Amino acid sequence: MNGDVLAPVVLVGMSVREVQARDLLQEVAHEHRATVAYLQMGDPSVSAELTRLADRGAERIVLVGVSLGSLAPAASWLRRIAGHWLRQRPGRRPVVEVATRLANDPVQVREVLGLLRPVTGAEAGLESAAWEDVPGHRHQALVCRGPRCTAMGSDRTAEAVILELMRLGQSDDDVLITHTGCQFPCNHAPVVSVQPDDVWYGDVDPDVARRIVAEHLVGRRPVESARLPRTRRAQAGDEPLV
């Protein structure tokens, strides 16, 4: 690791799948005397862990991105986040090094620890003209990643939805996929809801997920066999439902 073997190492879960695999990530971190942080939807965040280590006096910090699935952001996103943190860090700043590629399984962590590049602060920022406008999507599919849905395999559901949309040539301007916390009807996990159609699906395994994509999100016909009943309590001032 380029010299100082005592530099704190942080294993960074890059996607929601690594948040689900928290226990495994902690085991791997223990083997490398490392800590764990998450790029998204998990605590601590990368920025929070960098701040904690820097405040404790670390002069050098090593970040290794870990992806146990197929849908994690590229390693460049970890550099982007670390670069933003470095620019915003007041006072003394540690040297931050990031592995140039992700570890795709526990065995690869040791290998990528030898592939480090310093963060300079000149990395791309967190804003871009490409991210200015709300996408022009006709549907938003919300995939529940709450505790029960996660335990029932919603990571595979999400992966199936995304890969099928890609296979059918759909982009964020067609269907926007959003990972959510608990959507409530947990007995029917994994749950997926589709807006603005207000259609809810339960027991969405990968096969059902692919049907939802092809028949509903692309074909615009809800999959009735997987649909959950949906009632809405009338409130004062509500417009009548058409």
What are these regions (language model features)?
Residues 1-131, 183:
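Active-site-proximal alpha-helix that buttresses catalytic centers in soluble enzyme cores
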Residues 25-34, 159-171:
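Short helix-loop-beta junction
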Residues 106-117, 205-217:
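Two-component system phosphotransfer/interaction surface
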Residues 117-128, 153-169:
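Short, charged low-complexity linear segments at domain edges
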Residues 122-146:
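Polybasic, low-complexity association/targeting segments
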Residues 134-142, 162-183:
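Immediate flanking context of iron-sulfur cluster ligation sites
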Residues 139-154, 177-198:
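Local cysteine-cluster metal-coordination motifs and their immediate loop/turn environment
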Residues 172-188, 208-240:
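Short Fe-S-cluster ligation motifs
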